[in-house]
């Protein structure tokens, strides 16, 4: 398939799988039978049935779940990369598919975060979906990890004091990793 055809497959997937109007049929239409599906906020999945069960649980917990693209898709060969943002309000079922803790039913907590996903498309089917997301933000918003680390302000970084004292904090160029 061409790069443009691969981008069209991913565009449809983003809209129908991750969008506000979830279409469960898109899983059988566009996901390979043994799709590899990985995000930092959830256990790795393999196969259409596992992805379908995940989507059902995730959307039962967050009925207004909606993610959308924030930049044009980038493609090379079989790979398509998309940037996105989105989230939802936890007004539904209990949800325990998180790396830390779980949510009882209907907490009313809102999560909104961003990420980048790399998808592999082979013969018109998505064989891999690997997401790199800002899971820490979502976990904080859901109350599963503290909003601050050891009393630091929310926008702070553990290394911020070091950075302010170092030459890097004064506009010096970053060190090169070249040998």
Where are these regions (language model features)?
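C-terminal and inter-domain tail/linker signature
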Residues: 1-179
